[in-house]
Amino acid sequence: MTQDASPILTSLLDTDAYKLHMQQAVFHRYRHITVAAEFRCRGDELLGEYADEIRHQITLMSQLALTDDEYQYLSGLPFFKNDYLNWLRAFRFNPEQVTVSDNDGELDIRITGLWCETILWEVPLLAVISEIVHRRRSAHVTADLAVSQLRSKLQQFNALSADIDITHFKLMDFGTRRRFSREIQHAIVSHLKDEFPYLVGTSNYDLARKLSLDPVGTQAHEWFQAHQQISPVLANSQRVALQAWLDEYPNQLGVALTDCITMDAFLRDFDKTFADRYQGLRHDSGDPVEWGEKAIAHYEKLGIDPMSKTLVFSDNLDLEKALSLYRHFYQRVKLVFGIGTRLTCDIPGIKPLNIVIKLVECNDKPVAKLSDSPGKTICHDPAFVDELREAFALPLVKKAS
């Protein structure tokens, strides 16, 4: 495999905002906790042939460091404290934390180390894998081609939305991890900023800084997964995670991800105190309409006006699906739509990679993500899945991947 000597990534901020938001919370609360995370390809792609090139890019990532301009930019945001930013300034990726191998054609990647350090690997590494694969398979693709496709999708959106009040539609770019390339994500988000008045932000800190957009993102599944071993009582782990997040961010970044266990298990823990303090909820698996109806009913049961809260939908969306959800809900609750792959790798003839990196251990003990979609369940240890299901009073067994 021919290697491109130049680095794909050129900024430490070329990552999802929630990684820095979680990293600060881990830095302040759980600095000595260790974790392990693993790569999964949910499709039938054999990516092992790219292992050497991926390893080369991982080595180059050790050169990334926060620049003075980036430090000043983060300092001007309301989220970060000086102790964390000074630590981040000295942070460097450590390639020894990542093992990459070609296992009979399958790509195996395992990341181990301190949570506060390894937390930053996932998003840029997935972006690197995606770009390497697409660059090798589809060298002919240009940013102009991607933007041309986006233009036609925006025209379609405008036609489909002509009969309703679309002024409350809000779009966020969530496209870093499975983008075709860094160049194409930049071109897509730039075009949206210029041509689509409903773009409210991007999850990518580098793009947010360069394009003067709001950075968006709160926490990921790993926040809740790690607390399965941090919390002394497993059944309390979700509440412990929700409270720890509020302790770190009392008045901001208040959107909670609901499907680490399941939506039903989440709502049992999401009492009036949490529901009042969190600004909203994020959907990432299962039927989105059913989920939204459950969220609205829960707020109403607690005596909270759903129009004072925000539902963020981010599971495999495109503009058409987002518009359908908007039609269903917009008069009853505030809405935001996070679209990723269908923005930054939506190119005729190109099949996006369905790849993830997920936590599998915390302090050498198993953790699990169950989710509201059976195919998204991740855990090494069937006995721990059973323990988790029992702790959260879950019925049906779902097969772990």
Swiss-Prot record:
Supply the EC number(s): 6.3.4.21
**Pathway noted in the entry:** Cofactor biosynthesis; NAD(+) biosynthesis; nicotinate D-ribonucleotide from nicotinate: step 1/1
Q: Which residues carry this modification: Phosphohistidine?
A: H221
Keywords attached to this Swiss-Prot or TrEMBL record, sorted alphabetically, are: Ligase, Phosphoprotein, Pyridine nucleotide biosynthesis
* This protein's GO CC annotations: cytosol
Annotated NCBIfam families = NAPRTase, PRK05321.1
Q: Which InterPro entries match?
A: N/Namide_PRibTrfase, NAPRTase_N, Nic_PRibTrfase, Nic_PRibTrfase-Fam, Nicotinate_pribotase-like_C
Q: Pfam families from the entry? A: NAPRTase, NAPRTase_N
Q: Which GO terms describe its biological process?
A: NAD biosynthetic process via the salvage pathway
| Family to which the UniProt record says this protein belongs | Belongs to the NAPRTase family.
PTM annotation: Transiently phosphorylated on a His residue during the reaction cycle. Phosphorylation strongly increases the affinity for substrates and increases the rate of nicotinate D-ribonucleotide production. Dephosphorylation regenerates the low-affinity form of the enzyme, leading to product release.
According to the UniProt entry, its GO molecular function terms are:
nicotinate phosphoribosyltransferase activity
Its biological purpose:
Catalyzes the synthesis of beta-nicotinate D-ribonucleotide from nicotinate and 5-phospho-D-ribose 1-phosphate at the expense of ATP.
Q: What is this protein called?
A: Nicotinate phosphoribosyltransferase
Catalytic activity line of the entry: nicotinate + 5-phospho-alpha-D-ribose 1-diphosphate + ATP + H2O = nicotinate beta-D-ribonucleotide + ADP + phosphate + diphosphate
